[in-house]
Amino acid sequence: MLRFQRFASSYAQAQAVRKYPVGGIFHGYEVRRILPVPELRLTAVDLVHSQTGAEHLHIDRDDKNNVFSIAFKTNPPDSTGVPHILEHTTLCGSVKYPVRDPFFKMLNKSLANFMNAMTGPDYTFFPFSTTNPQDFANLRGVYLDSTLNPLLKQEDFDQEGWRLEHKNITDPESNIVFKGVVYNEMKGQISNANYYFWSKFQQSIYPSLNNSGGDPMKITDLRYGDLLDFHHKNYHPSNAKTFTYGNLPLVDTLKQLNEQFSGYGKRARKDKLLMPIDLKKDIDVKLLGQIDTMLPPEKQTKASMTWICGAPQDTYDTFLLKVLGNLLMDGHSSVMYQKLIESGIGLEFSVNSGVEPTTAVNLLTVGIQGVSDIEIFKDTVNNIFQNLLETEHPFDRKRIDAIIEQLELSKKDQKADFGLQLLYSILPGWTNKIDPFESLLFEDVLQRFRGDLETKGDTLFQDLIRKYIVHKPCFTFSIQGSEEFSKSLDDEEQTRLREKITALDEQDKKNIFKRGILLQEKQNEKEDLSCLPTLQIKDIPRAGDKYSIEQKNNTMSRITDTNGITYVRGKRLLNDIIPFELFPYLPLFAESLTNLGTTTESFSEIEDQIKLHTGGISTHVEVTSDPNTTEPRLIFGFDGWSLNSKTDHIFEFWSKILLETDFHKNSDKLKVLIRLLASSNTSSVADAGHAFARGYSAAHYRSSGAINETLNGIEQLQFINRLHSLLDNEETFQREVVDKLTELQKYIVDTNNMNFFITSDSDVQAKTVESQISKFMERLPHGSCLPNGPKTSDYPLIGSKCKHTLIKFPFQVHYTSQALLGVPYTHKDGSALQVMSNMLTFKHLHREVREKGGAYGGGASYSALAGIFSFYSYRDPQPLKSLETFKNSGRYILNDAKWGVTDLDEAKLTIFQQVDAPKSPKGEGVTYFMSGVTDDMKQARREQLLDVSLLDVHRVAEKYLLNKEGVSTVIGPGIEGKTVSPNWEVKEL
């Protein structure tokens, strides 16, 4: 156990210590302990509510982005998803706020930059963050009443959980089907092969924990009464852990908590510490799962090996295990990467790989996907661990030093959402009786580690391997992709549905029809929202933040508090330089620079040096749009950051990867990279299918959208898939891949049109970096590759005979988009289009697509820079109905919507949540550098947004939406008899 002997190192921390003396009583709360943490510039205060036993953790820090959360321990009793469905229904109305979904309604009555509710494996929590004190008080009140006093109506359970309902609600002769937001959400989740693997792994090794999100096969067993019982048992102050962070007075929160908890007593809880399987001998579990259509048949298996390694309550041992996991599996020089991935045994690490502290035990897992022979995989892993024990110095000391350096740097790197990240790191352990102060004692753990490393060296890790892994029982888990799996899920659902329907009598069926009609009527009701607290437009400052930037030649500098760190960004404008046929190779080129190696060094050697001396080096390619014209700006970017004293290393590494990356010598590494990219294609679509659909639709309108589709969309996935098919033909691979990347290197690496952005904490440091930039540019070619190529603005749009495309994926649900043409960033109509998109989302599409249609999410968005108006739906069981809703939105606004000034103001509040969201120091001024959007442009747009009227909304609805068909894209399974030519183009991947 680490000792909590700390001393305040600053005036602010000393003040906090005096403000909250140990033993002090504040509104029924007693201060139990206080902990200054100077290295994080914070003071932690641990309090307990005397009447109920509720625990509160306050993090006092000079940060205006304040955070509140209330969390409950919620062990799932089964896999019906009751914790998850309760999380949803809790936010569907409460005693004080008896409106449908006050949580969603508060999204446009607030300036919160984050609002959410989340279900963990054995806990549920409700966090938000905002910079506005009144907003903080408003949301805190809504969150507390929603969680402690929810209405939990039957119709909310039906809507958010699951229900039997006619496919066509108004037609009693139409088929009865399963509906429900969570039901469809989880159907979408199991379409993601990575999620399915992780979920089944957790259920196999930790069956007592059940599936808190819900297994669709089990969700339909949940009854309304079970939901009420689960809330009564778990959503009680005695089971609550509340959290605050920031610079607002703690006493205001304690006062409100005490008032909310006043009607409750102390309730004894005997939560059983849920344990995993009893791993006394080796266990091997094999299952079938989703096939990945982008991988060959022999690469359809995911497999992992897991060992139980002590308990997370031993925080130091857990820290050592995490370092060991990092040494084993993180980066190109890690032994598991070299022996498992580079060797070709697998394509990439599986989603469960690494060290995971669970409820009661730590799990260390080594897993890969795309494995052809599981026995070879197991033998290789076992041999690696055995060799690590038999080698005198198995780990390069530089790698360990690099890990320490990364930990130190991460502590100094200031993030805008620091409070939320702190909550996420503390809460899982805190709900399982791990002292939250232990999680904050970063420096103490690091000092102990340094000392042990000096005295014990590598035996520190060898002892862990000997204690927990070698000759210890192992849990092996694998899932083989099956072409029949998707059909088996459909068949199971139909069988389950038939069983439910068979059990119904005629009266039950009449009740189902009536209930569907009543639910729709409820959803259509105009509600009185006056009970909800709200901010006003006057709470939004008319003038936005401006960042002072100094420009000298090709370099911009921003001086701000960076905590001793310097961030450097470089970019080269590639317009009119690259031949169109090389555009698809650009993302692979950027990835290759930080994966392959040079003529003289492997990337594993380079990577270790990067981690030892910097916070990281990255390269990327992106396309933005000119704010005045929407013309494309194709950019190659390269970034790096380090301590002020080490910025010379950034330029050293940039020079190395830009000038010396050798595609020919490292072609084997290039093949590994292509395999890795191909293996993650399908899961990336399952995670963000609506974004892929939106991008594909937008690519029909502007060259910037078409380029973005080539670089980041479905077309890029197809391209990587094609390259993957060339790997076994060496001659073709050299010609079609290696030679093309080498050619790109000549086009890209040149100082022409190259610019830089420095973020640091002093003019002296900025001048030092400017000098380093000059020396760096002297090493690069100049003028060898000028804009003499095809005009980037002429890049071809996606040509299609019809305006509807189905892109087939083996999912259980769909993702949809419909796109229409908008205007450039500086055009005044852009602000009205953005406000209209928000009003459609909150006042129309949420009800139609989610509440009625059963999709997990849906709405409208406007990309101000790209000038594209988009509709979308996410995990949608009724994609064609959603598309019809999108198509009729213009008519709805002009004929049916009864929007008033309040609706307009709420839309503006929602928009400014992101416009005025806090930025980290490294993000200040970067929009101007990357996109050319000046402070004056942002201010003009800000004023336009604030001044948008209802007449403006109606005008742009008529001009840009009414009678406009748009371009539609659906991603997911085929829809029998509906998505056929000539009206639809169907793409098979």
Swiss-Prot record:
This protein's UniProt keywords: Hydrolase, Metal-binding, Metalloprotease, Mitochondrion, Phosphoprotein, Protease, Transit peptide, Zinc
Keyword Transcription: no
GO function term, MF aspect, one: ATP-dependent peptidase activity
Effect of mutating residue 84 to Y: Loss of function
Transit peptide: 1-16
Co-factor binding comment: Binds 1 zinc ion per subunit.
Cofactor dependence: Zn(2+)
EC number from the UniProt entry: 3.4.24.-
Additional comment: Present with 6140 molecules/cell in log phase SD medium.
UniProt protein name: Presequence protease, mitochondrial
Source organism: Saccharomyces cerevisiae (strain ATCC 204508 / S288c) (Baker's yeast)
